[in-house]
Amino acid sequence: MGKKQHIAIFTTASLPWLTGTAVNPLFRAAYLSKDGERDVTLVIPWLSLKDQALVYPNNITFASPSEHEKYIRQWLEERVGFTSGFSIKFYPGKFSRDKRSILAVGDISEVIPDKEADIAVLEEPEHLTWFHHGKRWKTKFRLVIGIIHTNYLEYVKREKNGQMQAFLLKYLNNWVVGIYCHKVIRLSAATQDYSGSIVCNVHGVNPKFLEIGKKKREQQQNGDQAFTKGAYFIGKMVWSKGYKELLHLFKNHQKELSALEVDLFGSGEDSDEVQKAAKKLEMAVRVHPARDHADALFHDYKLFLNPSTTDVVCTTTAEALAMGKIVVCANHCSNEFFKQFPNCWTFDESKGFVQLILKALAEEPAQLTDAQRHDLSWEAATERFLKAAELDKPFEKKLSRSTSIYMSTSLNLQQTVDDASAYVHHVASGFEISRRMFGAIPGSLKPDEELSKELGLSDSGRK
């Protein structure tokens, strides 16, 4: 038997912040390590108490990394139903208020000792490497796989001078991802394109949603009415997360949809404005605070509406399908993966949106087969990841005799270009002035005394 693969998964966020880059890499680590064939380490940011208070909900904070790890493992075990065998390590991070995200401090690749460095998975590689100053990822690890979660270009386009910012960011992202990743997996075609990248949804749904869907299927098979409620939408309550499109569609088709009752669930900076807009409609649209999508409150809804085109792969759409519901969503590349499921109905224009809603109200959802349910699971997502990353076969680097000289010369030239490019980035990321120019948090070149003490870093690690 060959040597076990050691996979280190680096990500940009952590529970209890329920964002995609906190939740999905955690499930990935659990399912990659489930069969015991790989050694898996999840590497997540550690924040000072001050930053924890800004990021984590419900006043949850942790006095130590061990306390934080205990919380994460308990949360995970409650959802997957098995004890995970992966390890958790922390890297120093700081919260950027203006970017609303956590940025790494220092060389986070040092968290994995050189003797253990084998395969690195960078969840949001552009985010993790914008300001990276340290050992080159491709040098330290045999294989570096980047997973693109977010379309940062769409976010910056909404800011002041957005078009120019997006233009510059596109080239910065291409630069750092090319320098630091061997392979790039994009969750959908709604992300920025990268040279040599492949599109593959390597995410699954929380097993709880599949259990809910299984019970609903049993009710349908027994002839019971499984879905007694109408339509709903759930998501962070900001206009860009689908609320703008949804309320616009309702406003333009109030007469046709007069019999429809819709519940909107979410919290966010646009909550008050969404509520005001909903009240102006001549149809029943109720606005509620955010709730966990697995809450029993949602089980009996038949129809999930999601006209958003700003997601890369919408988690709530996957969850609704797993629960056996009909989903009406936009015919958009972010929903391409979901089109294989019989309950995913897509529309191109507002007329189609109305027709699908009326059809859904008159029909019952199709019962998902076991194979379709499997495709939504983390087991299937893990299979897709291993195949896309080519980790399901032995690692080999062989050149045929006829092409070896040409290929060797070509690879050497490419290596020289990559090395030069990496050197330029290393130099630029080593000066406070240039780091600040590109948006780094002041003083993030190395961990401060507080972070070093909390993580038990040596003085040499801070130099």
Swiss-Prot record:
Keyword flag Nucleotide-binding: no
GO process terms (BP): galactolipid biosynthetic process; nodulation
Broad enzyme group: transferase
Keywords of this entry: Chloroplast, Glycosyltransferase, Membrane, Nodulation, Plastid, Plastid outer membrane, Signal, Transferase
Domain of life, source organism: Eukaryota
Catalytic activity: a 1,2-diacyl-3-O-(beta-D-galactosyl)-sn-glycerol + UDP-alpha-D-galactose = a 1,2-diacyl-3-O-[alpha-D-galactosyl-(1->6)-beta-D-galactosyl]-sn-glycerol + UDP + H(+)
Keyword Iron-sulfur: no
A single cellular component GO annotation: chloroplast outer membrane
Membrane-spanning residues: none
EC number of the protein: 2.4.1.241
Alphabetical list of SUPFAM superfamilies matching this protein: UDP-Glycosyltransferase/glycogen phosphorylase
Expression sites (tissue/organ): High expression in nodules infected cells, and low in nodule and root vascular tissue.
Signal peptide positions on this chain: 1-22
GO terms, molecular function: digalactosyldiacylglycerol synthase activity
Family: Belongs to the glycosyltransferase group 1 family. Glycosyltransferase 4 subfamily.
Protein name: Digalactosyldiacylglycerol synthase 2, chloroplastic
